[in-house]
Amino acid sequence: MTDHHTRETPRNPYAGAYPGNLFMVVAPSGAGKSTLVNALLAGDDAIRLSISYTTRPPRPKELDGEHYHFTTVDDFMKRHDAGEFLESAEVHGNYYGTSRVWIEDQMKSGHDVLLEIDWQGAQQVKKQFHNAVEIFILPPSLEALEERLKKRGQDEPNVITRRLLAAGSEMAHAAEAEYVVINENFDRALSELQCLVAATRSRFASQYARHTQLFVQLGIHLPHA
């Protein structure tokens, strides 16, 4: 679906910077994105996970308000038309959307925010937040991706086939990401993810937004656009 409420911000990378950072983790189904994200969040209480709205039916053990805000197509479209979503997309026949107000409130308060998102959504977010960091998680091979999809036992064989067919076109968009992590060894992939978060927090724009008074006292000012 196309989000008609996307509002593009100025291209100055320092304009309107919030104290909090915005991370987007993108991956095809079965690449291990959610497992890596959960491990990252467990060891870093400064990151808030954005909970998306979706029209997808809940999977076993998924809770409304914890894993997703599960809603109807009618309610989703009303929210979309009202401009409530920072980004929205249709994936495998279901709609997903991210709350704009919640994201901005968290970042203004100094919290980092992480979005588990698809490549379409990442493109929409980057039009509005040019400092957003996209991290693409790749599997070590297509064979490994298929095996992981089968092992998790969440989808019927026809759904797995559809996800594998979609994975090729999805992974082609890894070229649009700032960083790529290949999830062959979980511990190594998690370490790389943690390093990318730490490096992002040390960027000039991020440090200036968090410590503006210190920078001004030291005579350090924002570069011109």
Swiss-Prot record:
ATP binds at A27, P28, S29, G30, A31, G32, K33, S34. It comes from the Bacteria. InterPro entries: GK/Ca_channel_bsu (IPR008145), Guanylate_kin-like_dom (IPR008144), Guanylate_kinase (IPR017665), Guanylate_kinase_CS (IPR020590), P-loop_NTPase (IPR027417). The keyword Transferase applies. GO terms for cellular component: cytosol. The keyword Signal does not apply. Its EC number is 2.7.4.8. Pfam families: Guanylate_kin. GO terms for molecular function: ATP binding; guanylate kinase activity. Residues 20-198 form the Guanylate kinase-like domain. It is found in: Cytoplasm. It catalyses: GMP + ATP = GDP + ADP. HAMAP family: Guanylate_kinase (MF_00328). Essential for recycling GMP and indirectly, cGMP. Belongs to the guanylate kinase family. This is Guanylate kinase. It comes from Paraburkholderia xenovorans (strain LB400). The lineage of its organism: Bacteria, Pseudomonadati, Pseudomonadota, Betaproteobacteria, Burkholderiales.
